[in-house]
Amino acid sequence: GLGRSSWSRQLLAQVLETSLPLVVDADALNLLALEPAHRENWIITPHPGEAGRLLGLPAAGVQQDRLAAVRGLVERFGGTAVLKGAGSLVCTAGRPIAVCTVGNPGMATAGMGDVLTGVIAALIAQRLPLADAAVLGVCLHGQAGDRAAAGGERGLLARDLIDELRHVVNAQGETA
């Protein structure tokens, strides 16, 4: 990962200077917890532990009131916040909080957040507004996870979602 070194901090500071839209995950979130920033054209994607560090709360406190936590993330950091977990939440100021009703416990494995970040970034590259890219990305990711877990949730790997994402995206195109 990016780590928490002085080099990592300098890299993040340079990235934050750009006006381009960003999707921020993993170690970059941990760096933000140390040096908070506020911007409108980004999506932060913490799991409850990362959200706790960003908000100065224990992960259990985040889980206790996920709606307040995701609102707090947007208030403190701006942009759009995706609070990952069972019933992932997507919050953008001025919009209702979106709740993802798809996905499964097998998705709580290493690399799943990386896949989600890639899906959201790909949607942004297709010029979707950030809030829409976050909601659609979370839903597509969850649907792909459910398809990948059709044979059982145990042993599900992040790479198992890749082929399923193609099917889910193409199915969306057929209904559009």
Predicted feature residues:
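Short, charged, surface-exposed loops that flank catalytic or proteolytic processing sites
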Residues: 57-66, 127-132, 153-156
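Gly/Ser/Thr-rich beta-alpha loop segments that engage phosphate groups in nucleotides
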Residues: 3-5, 87, 105, 112-116, ...
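Charged C-terminal helix
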Residues: 143-176
